[in-house]
Amino acid sequence: MDSKNIHWHKVADYEEEINFSDNNIAVVNANGKQVCLGKYNGSLFAFAYKCPHAGGILAEGWIDAIGNIICPQHRYKYSIINGRNVSGEGYYLTHWPVEKRDDGIFVGVFS
């Protein structure tokens, strides 16, 4: 990943102002794009709003005990580390880096 090609977009001033659902997933706006923000073991990660398989809304899914994102539509599982489908179907979930800084929470979008 070449950090020169990342454009950082502020999505919140503080983590506490992010409206996480009971499933530890929130929807935020990063440069006009709906992005899911997940929270697992104290870390934040960003991933696509829709599942690449059939367009299920991932904000309505959940994060399992080992940190995979689960689509509510067909239960496809995606790694929060690399976006790979761990269910074996070969799909890839777009994901972006997240940084907690003194001046806010930022999602890095690749150009």
Q: Which role does the model predict for each range below?
A:
Residues 61-67, 86-90:
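Short linker/helix segments within small regulatory modules
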Residues 1-64, 97-111:
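N-terminal pre-ligand scaffold of iron-sulfur
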Residues 51, 71-74:
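Short cysteine clusters
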Residues 77-111:
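Short Fe-S-cluster ligation motifs
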Residues 12, 74-76:
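Intrinsically disordered, low-complexity segments enriched in small/polar residues
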